[in-house]
Curated annotation (Swiss-Prot):
One of its GO terms (molecular function) is large ribosomal subunit rRNA binding. This is Large ribosomal subunit protein uL10. It comes from Azoarcus sp. (strain BH72). The gene is rplJ. GO terms for cellular component: ribonucleoprotein complex; ribosome. PANTHER family: 39S RIBOSOMAL PROTEIN L10, MITOCHONDRIAL. Forms part of the ribosomal stalk, playing a central role in the interaction of the ribosome with GTP-bound translation factors. SUPFAM superfamilies: Ribosomal protein L10-like (SSF160369). The lineage of its organism: Bacteria, Pseudomonadati, Pseudomonadota, Betaproteobacteria, Rhodocyclales. InterPro entries: Ribosomal_uL10, Ribosomal_uL10-like_sf, Ribosomal_uL10_bac, Ribosomal_uL10_bac_type.
Length: 167
């Protein structure tokens, strides 16, 4: 059953709102995926903060017109699932990780920072660590000297206690 005009306008408005805040859109073809697998993909997307939806391509074309993602319109053919995220790598990572384990989901294209990406570009974007992962690594690097210094002070204090007890 098709959507009536009001429903179509609502979908375009919803997608436009998501695209307005987005940094990345990743697109994949999803022919023949089992419902359970698609439900698992949606759950993973929700955890990662990715807006994931199967949409009519014409409605998405309207939603991305006059946005930095407008160049993606030529790639929107066939049955597609759209991942839209504010995190630069989250949408690409969710779809790419799922595609590795399910050959019925095929990455097709994406867009990041106004540039249209092909399948290889989306895979490259997905391989970049997320912001949270990079911050965790930075924090670990910054804490290493402090924890090493604290460990040295504790060892020195223990050594002095042992010398004081022996004397």
């Amino acid at each position: 059953m098709g959507l009536n005009l009001d429903d179509k306008k609502a979908v375009v408005a919803e997608v436009s709102a998501q695209v307005a805040n987005a940094q990345t859109i990743a697109v994949a073809e999803y022919r023949g995926i089992a419902v359970g697998d698609l439900t698992a993909l949606r759950a993973k997307a929700r955890e990662s903060g990715v807006y994931l939806r199967v949409l009519k391509n014409t409605l998405v074309r309207r939603a991305i017109a006059e946005t930095p993602f407008a160049g993606l319109a030529d790639q929107l053919t066939g049955p597609l699932i759209y991942g839209i995220s504010e995190d630069p790598v989250a949408a690409a990572k969710v779809l790419n990780d799922f595609a590795k384990g399910n050959d019925k989901l095929v990455l097709k294209a994406g867009s990041y920072a106004g540039n249209v990406l092909d399948k290889a570009g989306v895979q490259a974007l997905a391989s970049i660590p997320s912001r949270e992962e990079l911050l965790a690594k930075l924090l670990g690097v910054m804490q290493a000297p402090v924890s090493g210094f604290a460990g040295a002070l504790a060892a020195l204090a223990k050594k002095r206690e042992e010398e004081g007890a022996a004397a």
